[in-house]
Amino acid sequence: MGRSLVALLVLAWGAGAQDRLPPVAAEKMTEAQRKAVADYRNLRNADLTGPPWSVLLRVPDWVVPAVEMRLHVQNRPVLPNRLTELAILIAAREWTNNYEWNAHSAAAARAGLASAVVSDVAAGRRPEHMAEDEEILYDFCAELLHNKSLSDATYARALARFGEAGVVELANLEGYYVYLSMVMNTARSPLPAGAKPQLASFPK
């Protein structure tokens, strides 16, 4: 990625990007928020420090269900990690969510997803050189996001390749990461310190 494009992305991300819902200071938390923080720590063995969890903390009862869904994706996936990460990137690209994209583009590379596929998704293009299972997954996710439904042909291909459990997991993945993207886009959640945005907004 050229320096000029990086600079444009940084400017676009920074324009009007004030964090609307920053982390709640510990001394200002309600009892319900403190309990949600403790439950989060017990589930993830980590502190609740940033988005999307710090945003969800405004409604504490949302935190644990959202974390449990994330833990399923991490620890008990139906699909291989390479396909799971591709599905997540498709959702993050659709909603231009740089926070999820930055985290999961690195995870996708570790899972074996080709860099050319990642680059094409980032640019909003259907990748040209995908494995067959990646093509089936991409078409499923893109069609569901764009058309809000699936054709019989697209559903049949996904069902034949991934089975009923895989199809349901794919729909859940897209819904879950769209949900997180909507939460963070509403809050204008910033990237971690030192991170650079990798996604430009789609033309209006």
Question: Where are the regions that the model predicts?
Answer:
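N-terminal signal peptide c-region/cleavage motif recognized by signal peptidases
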Residues: 12-14
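Hydrophobic alpha-helical segments
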Residues: 17-204
